[in-house]
Amino acid sequence: VLDGERGICLDLSALEPVQGVENKIFHFDGRTLTPVEIRADGYYKLVPTESLPTLEINGVKMHRSKDIDPGEDARAKTALVVRPGDIVLDTCGGLGYSAVFAVKAGAVRVISTE
């Protein structure tokens, strides 16, 4: 596994502790792999999909990921409502997919809040 910015190489033996772990994304700090998750007022974790990850809170996915990837879902939804020149209020901003696709659809400003 390479870190493109610094060219760090991860020895494959470092992956042994996470071998077989499914539905989690890990962060590598240069020495160890740690699940990207939070355990405060609930359980939050990033879950991999075929493309962009989805956020899961207490077992509930925050993005559609069955038969569509979260990015394509956000693109399709924003294409229905955002027009060039729009100012968009994105509530429940989450991972920012809707905000990104609102800009790509021509929004001149996106105000995003969680």
Give the location of each predicted region.
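Conserved SAM-binding motif I beta-strand of class I
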Residues: 109-114
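Conserved SAM-binding loop of SAM-dependent methyltransferases across substrates and taxa
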Residues: 95-107
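Short hydrophobic/aromatic-rich motifs at helix boundaries and adjacent loops
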Residues: 48-51, 92
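Generic hydrophobic segment detector
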Residues: 33-45, 57-59, 64-68, 95
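N-terminal auxiliary segments of SAM/dcSAM-dependent transferases
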Residues: 1-49
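Conserved class I S-adenosyl-L-methionine
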Residues: 83-95
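Generic detector of intrinsically disordered, low-complexity, polar/charged segments
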Residues: 4, 56, 91-93
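SAM-dependent Rossmann-like transferase core, predominantly class I methyltransferases
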Residues: 52-83
